[in-house]
Structure formats: structure tokens, C-alpha cells
């Protein structure tokens, strides 16, 4: 579930914001659309007759344009202000070191234990770097999917999809996912 992965969810959010901006033409509306939807913000701009966020925020009425939608952009600006000078608001902050990693695209479906063995990478490292992989993958009841961008520590940057496929071997590569058991 890539929603659990801060890197993938950030990429998806950036893509949505870029789309909203292309559709709406202003960053305040694009950011508000992240909460309210691009169609909803387009409707608001058309009804009010402007793309000016302040005017829309003060005059647009809709049963769905409530507190969260009205305050999404101002909340973003507040968070941005804090991010630009966090020490002013929180005092001294100890920052975690930058996470460095390398990604390879899974060439086929494969078991996590086979991947771990082929790469010679500890399971904890794989788990920490791949939060989108859920418990069934780690327990072995599901496979890491083909096309998944497997994140490895930067020290493993010599690995490619092709090298992984060779290291796994044909008996450890699968064309499809393990079928889920259904309970009656």
C-alpha cells in the first residue's frame, strides 16, 4: 500500500498538485483543490467569477466548501512559515540525517525472503526502506509485486532489475500474485 510510504505518497501529492495547478491556474486554488477537489474549485471560481482565493474564500457558499476546505490553503501557508524557520517556533531541532537509497524495479513477482537472500540485505533494512510492503508480504503469504520500486540502502547501488532477476533465478520469479485465501 504505497499510501504508507512517505516518498511515494509525496510523489503522488506533487503530481496531484501539478495537475490541479494546470487545471486551475493559481497555486492557492491548486492547494485548496488538494482538499476540495479540482472540479469543486473550478465550480467555486466560476460561481464567484474570479480565481482570487481571498474573494472565493469570503464569498463562495456550498454545502461541501466547509471549514477544512476554507482553511486548507491558510493552514498550508502557516506550515510553510514554520518550516522556513522552525527554531523560532520549537527551539533547537536535531534533524535526522538524510536518507540515502537506491531503487530497482521488481522484474517479476518474488518472495521477500528470496529477495533478501539474493541481495544479501538484512530484512530490517528492507522493511525500513519499504513501508509500502504490508504484513502479508513480510510473512510470505503474498509476493512483492512486479513493477514495485524496491528501495535499497545506497550502499547497494550496484543492483539493477536484471541483476536481481539473475540472482533470484527462474524458480523464484513468478508471473502473478499468490491468490488470497478466502474464508467462508
Feature locations, PLM:
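Extracytoplasmic and endomembrane cell-envelope/extracellular-matrix remodeling and assembly machinery
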Residues: 1-23, 28-184
Amino acid at each position: 500500500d504505497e499510501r504508507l510510504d512517505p516518498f511515494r505518497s509525496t510523489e503522488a501529492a506533487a503530481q496531484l498538485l501539478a495537475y490541479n495547478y494546470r487545471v486551475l491556474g493559481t497555486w492557492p486554488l491548486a492547494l485548496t483543490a488538494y482538499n476540495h477537489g479540482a472540479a469543486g474549485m473550478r465550480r467555486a471560481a466560476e460561481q464567484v467569477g474570479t480565481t482570487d482565493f481571498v474573494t472565493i474564500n469570503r464569498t463562495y457558499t456550498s454545502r461541501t466548501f466547509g471549514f477544512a476546505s476554507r482553511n486548507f490553503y491558510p493552514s498550508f501557508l502557516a506550515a510553510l512559515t514554520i518550516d522556513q524557520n522552525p527554531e523560532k517556533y520549537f527551539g533547537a531541532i536535531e534533524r535526522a540525517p538524510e536518507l540515502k537509497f537506491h531503487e530497482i524495479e521488481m522484474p517479476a513477482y518474488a518472495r521477500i525472503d528470496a529477495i533478501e537472500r539474493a541481495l544479501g540485505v538484512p530484512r530490517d533494512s528492507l522493511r525500513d526502506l519499504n513501508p509500502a510492503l504490508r504484513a502479508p508480504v513480510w510473512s510470505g503469504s503474498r509476493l512483492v509485486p512486479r513493477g514495485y520500486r524496491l528501495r535499497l540502502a545506497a550502499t547497494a547501488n550496484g543492483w539493477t532489475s536484471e541483476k536481481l532477476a539473475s540472482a533470484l533465478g527462474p524458480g523464484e520469479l513468478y508471473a502473478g500474485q499468490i491468490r488470497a485465501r478466502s474464508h467462508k
